[in-house]
Structure formats: C-alpha cells, structure tokens
Amino acid sequence: MTPGERSLIQRALKTLDRHLHEPGVAFTSTRAAREWLILNMAGLEREEFRVLYLNNQNQLIAGETLFTGTINRTEVHPREVIKRALYHNAAAVVLAHNHPSGEVTPSKADRLITERLVQALGLVDIRVPDHLIVGGNQVFSFAEHGLL
C-alpha cells in the first residue's frame, strides 16, 4: 500500500467515525457501520474480536478490540465482554470479528460463542442487535440471516 493510499484510508476512517458519532445516527444496520468495519478489519492478518458499545438509541458510545488471536481463531471470554459493556454503561453491543481468509460464513465456534454471549449479556439486560463477520470486502450479519 502506498503512503497516498494509507492517507486516503485514514481520512475515510475519520470521516466515517465522525458520522457514526453524530447525534441521531444509529450504528446498527447502517452502510457507514459496515464500511467502517471493512476499512478497520479487512486487511488484518490475525483474527480480532471487537465490541461496539451502544446507548439506548443504538448510537455508538465506544468500540474496542477485546481479543486478538491467530490466523484462524481467537479465544473470546464472555466475562470480559460483560465487564467492558458494564464499564461503558452500554444498553447494547454489536459484536464483530474478522476472518483473515476472506470467508465470511460463520463457523460452528462462531455460532456457539454468539449464543453464549447473547445469553450472558441478556442476564445483565444488554442487548446484542448483531454479530458481524468481516472477510475481505464482505460482511456477514447474524441478524440478517436469522441467527440471533
């Protein structure tokens, strides 16, 4: 990637980030959210598991990488996800991780951890509107495929 391309991507990320923090902009199901995730996660060489913390209006409070793994897996600990969601006083969280292979189809492990997280977060009244998998320039939505 050339320095000019890196600069362009950084400017695009800043623009999308500003847009996602504007009052009234809901984070879930927005094109900007998907673009932001693709720009942030598509080129990663290792799996990363990120959590996007939302308020009651599904507006972005904060987002962070909680876990980093290897080229084909990362270990996710529900306790840590809950702890950070409570720290941010989130009403909801969007889960996101990448597949460095570019294949966005969820694995059995992806489905199982999603179920565990939805159940665990539900115990403390935190909704999970979606879990997104980024692979290359594609995004798979658990919600859109009826898996939540």
Swiss-Prot record:
Keywords annotated in UniProt: Hydrolase, Metal-binding, Metalloprotease, Protease, Zinc
Biological processes annotated in GO: proteolysis
Recorded GO MF terms: metal ion binding; metallopeptidase activity
Segments carrying motif JAMM motif: 97-110
MPN domain location: 26-148
Binding site for Zn(2+): H97, H99, D110
Statement: the UniProt record of this protein carries the keyword Cell inner membrane: no
The UniProt record lists the keyword Chloroplast: no
Domain of life: Bacteria
Any Pfam family hit: RadC
Stored SUPFAM superfamilies: JAB1/MPN domain
Family in the record: Belongs to the UPF0758 family.
PANTHER family: DNA REPAIR PROTEIN RADC, UPF0758 PROTEIN YEES-RELATED
Protein name in UniProt: UPF0758 protein YeeS
Species assigned in the record: Escherichia coli (strain K12)
Phylogenetic lineage: Bacteria, Pseudomonadati, Pseudomonadota, Gammaproteobacteria, Enterobacterales
